[in-house]
A protein has these predicted regions:
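Metal-dependent catalytic cores of enzymes that make or break cyclic nucleotides
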Residues: 19-233
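Amphipathic coiled-coil signal-transmission "stalk" helices
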Residues: 2-13
Length: 233
């Protein structure tokens, strides 16, 4: 059918977008985005069941969330190689540019035509927000990155609590956990015990405490996904 062909074409384009991000940023590997997507779906499914959502809605959202989570860092295609591939610490200016990957990614979905576009935009812009309002980019205009609300220092005011879209809060947990337990050029992988202790510690500050409880409920599934998509490092 035409609808099926269109869906397959959309999926193919999205997979190419994911590949583009991977070519630009050495950290955005295939295994990493697959793990983040897998963890996100597990957290969402358990949260949805806990909250008695209908199976039909869960299935539809799950498929959209998987692709949106894979594209969480797609805005990095707008960041220069000098910053993306810098081995040392960022200067304040470089960090400011790096943070723009959130709204730059959200801009790709600005003419929202589907539930997927809405979800992908939410994930791109909000996966670095913190539950306590200390994350980024905060309340900014998606087109320009300019602040819509500013804090006392003139910086954009961070989104906090349930101002952060649910799917951004979920992908944040998946992304941070994967970063902790993964080896990178500049750091060794943490042990699972240390990473889990850190995740628990950040409930209520970095993360939504309810979703951290859900994360621990699905830990066996998280381990299975982690084993399935091992990194080459």
């Amino acid at each position: 059918t035409v609808a099926l062909q269109r869906a397959q074409m959309t999926r193919a384009i999205l997979l190419r977008m994911i590949r583009m991000a991977e070519l630009r940023d050495p950290k955005e590997t295939g295994p990493h985005v697959n793990r983040v997507a897998g963890y996100s779906v597990e957290i969402y499914e358990r949260w949805a069941k806990n909250n008695k959502l209908e199976r039909k809605e869960i299935d539809r959202t799950r498929d959209n969330l998987r692709m949106a989570a894979m594209l969480h860092d797609v805005g990095k295609v707008a960041i220069s190689d000098m910053i993306l591939k810098k081995p040392g610490r960022f200067t304040d200016e470089e960090y400011g540019i790096m943070k723009s990957h959130t709204w730059q990614g959200a801009r790709l979905f600005i003419n929202k035509q589907s539930e997927f576009d809405e979800l992908a935009q939410q994930v791109a812009i909000s996966h670095h927000e913190n539950w306590d309002g200390t994350g980024y980019p905060g309340h900014v205009d998606i087109e320009s990155g300019k602040p819509l609300k500013t804090g006392p220092n003139g910086e954009p005011l961070g989104r906090k609590g349930e101002e952060i879209p649910l799917f951004g809060r979920i992908v944040s947990i998946a992304d941070v956990y994967d970063a902790l337990v993964s080896q990178r050029v500049y750091k060794d992988a943490w042990t699972e015990d240390d990473a889990l202790e850190e995740m628990r510690k950040m409930a209520g500050t970095k993360f939504d405490p309810e979703l951290i409880e859900v994360f621990f409920q699905v830990l066996p599934n998280i381990r299975t996904i982690s084993d399935k998509y091992k990194s080459d490092l």
